[in-house]
Amino acid sequence: MIKQLQIGDLTARFPVIQGGMGVGVSLSGLAGAVAAQGGIGIISTAQIGYREPDYQVNPHTANLRAVKKEIRRAKELAAGGIVGVNIMVATKGYEDYVKAAAEAGADLIISGAGLPVTLPEAASGVQREDGEIRQAKLSPIVSSVKSANVIMKYWMKKYNYLPDLVVIEGPLAGGHLGFDRKQLEDIEGMHYEEEVMRLSLIHISEPT
């Protein structure tokens, strides 16, 4: 029997978090379908508004509008399933995207491509459109024990908040990772499995 995935008060029937693929791949259709089947559907906010009529003139406004539209539609398709977003820290106007996702009712916000040091602040105190009093779960993407500890210590000190989960991306993940070209040329020699084991042993309530 497949074990459920528990993230605070959220329960996914299957321990599957669909990847956030940008520029029109991970939108409401895919995320809503994954969530409806018991996984966690993820919408990528990267250039999400490319189909909006004013995208070429005002991409920031178009993207924020699309973030809300796609989350609303995904949640309708999900029929109670878990819908989240992936927001890159490198995105211009990053905090605006976080607020838009939180307002639209995203259940989970995953953030990488940099250290999401302002994520808890941007996501807190946001009035959800559905009227629910519930903050989105927050997750940094990390590639090392060092980066995990840095973000947890910072969040705890500044916001008295710790990640609800941590996403680990290794050298084979194909994402925005903390590895240089030389390291990637010798992936087998990295012994990254050992780093994953050390990451899995971090007590999220007690960063070292």
Task: Identify the residue ranges that each predicted region occupies.
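Residue-level detector of conserved catalytic or cofactor/ligand-binding positions
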Residues: 202-208
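Active-site entrance/lid segments in N-terminal catalytic domains of soluble metabolic enzymes
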Residues: 1-200
